[in-house]
């Protein structure tokens, strides 16, 4: 009888020990996984903070270059800040025209102008020539840059050339909305970006027949439908306070 009680007690203790061991293993595994999640989340947060800081420093470098070229530069930490900065530059009642600027749409600027106290020229409702003439006489012209060098040179490529012509002359002021993704180390890489990234992406928007539309790669073509007709390199603005560039710490536009 005593032996049986001891045996039952021993088996019960053994089961309890096994149960406790299993619980400890599970808790350790859970804690490890939880710590790993926290570690990776912390790592991602650090990486995001590092990239944000890098982009901010890069933007300051670009802005310094723009200012040396008689152009004004602004840093926006996100799309909302970019929208606020753009609206601060445009007084109520202003006449605004625009080329094909996806970045202005992405930050909500086009909708804000359409809904606000502004005279927004919708070129889609006008004949091409009429829209171009209206843009030349506008108070503000909205655009993005296909690329910008880190020392402040703006690079744009165009098909019909209405956009690059308005950047060069005509509208009283030009506001560029430029994602930090478009900053390049030099003019050569900026021109390559305009051809190989911006133009090949923009080609997808149009009903055209070009090699880049079919393959996504630039072939330096002379197709009748090519949208790479005119390069505009803006290295200096003769007119003070005409060109304003808002650099957005985000990947926007083509």
Predicted regions located by residue number:
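Low-complexity, intrinsically disordered or signal/transmembrane-proximal segments
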Residues: 10, 17-21, 40-41
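N-terminal active-site beta-alpha-beta segment that forms phosphate/nucleotide-binding
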Residues: 55-142
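Conserved phosphate- and dinucleotide-binding cores of soluble alpha/beta proteins
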Residues: 136-254
């Amino acid at each position: 009888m005593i032996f049986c009680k001891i045996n039952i007690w021993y088996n019960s203790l053994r089961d309890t020990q096994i149960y406790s061991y299993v619980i400890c293993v599970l808790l350790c595994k859970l804690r490890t996984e939880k710590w790993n999640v926290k570690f990776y989340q912390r790592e991602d947060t650090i990486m995001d903070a590092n990239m944000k800081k890098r982009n901010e420093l890069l933007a300051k470098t670009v802005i310094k270059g723009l200012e040396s070229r008689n152009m004004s530069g602004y840093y926006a930490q996100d799309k909302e800040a970019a929208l606020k900065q753009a609206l601060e530059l445009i007084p109520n009642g202003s006449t605004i025209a625009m080329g094909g600027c996806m970045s202005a749409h992405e930050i909500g600027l086009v909708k804000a102008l359409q809904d606000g106290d502004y005279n927004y020229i919708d070129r889609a409702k006008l004949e091409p020539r009429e829209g171009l003439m209206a843009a030349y006489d506008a108070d503000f012209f909205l655009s993005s840059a296909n690329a910008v060098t880190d020392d402040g040179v703006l690079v744009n490529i165009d098909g019909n050339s209405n956009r690059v012509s308005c950047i060069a002359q005509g509208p009283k002021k030009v506001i560029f909305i430029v994602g930090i993704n478009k900053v390049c180390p030099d003019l050569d890489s900026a021109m390559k970006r305009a051809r190989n990234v911006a133009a090949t992406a923009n080609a997808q928007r149009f009903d055209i027949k070009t090699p880049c539309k079919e393959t996504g790669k630039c072939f330096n073509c002379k197709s009748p439908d090519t949208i790479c007709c005119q390069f505009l390199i803006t290295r200096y603005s003769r007119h003070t306070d005409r060109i304003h560039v808002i650099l957005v710490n985000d990947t926007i536009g083509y």
